[in-house]
Amino acid sequence: MKDEMEKIRELVEALLEKMGCPASANLIEYPENIFFSVHTKDGGILIGEDGERLRALNHVVHKITDKLFPETKDSLKFFIDVNDYQKQKIEEIKDMARLSAQRVRYFKKEIEMQPMSSYERRIIHATLTEYPDIATESTGEGRERRVVIRPL
């Protein structure tokens, strides 16, 4: 898998070059995530409003790597992060999940969160496993899928 990650790093750098935002991508491995960290003065251009362009860049790179490495496409889990945007977003989601769990505990009522991506929902589910008196469940369909946090 190390070889694939190096090729993906090179792909990310080549795409950034073609987009007119040359930058180096550093591979950073955490226990739960693999990031290609990109730092550039053109970060706002790559991130876009609410991370929209960054999500699109991640989507394109994943589609390309699915074609390049069809035998390992399900095991290649990674994200491209520009100027630590994703890292900060993950921390915000974890904080929001913990705050919501505290509210559920206090008021003994379920909370339905706003719609979010499957990745963001997974962060919430994983974060709240540390609360044995709280249950989480994803409900809804498509872009309206959200997490419901309820007391046990």
Residue ranges and their predicted role:
Residues 1-152:
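RNA-contacting regions in translation and RNA-metabolism proteins
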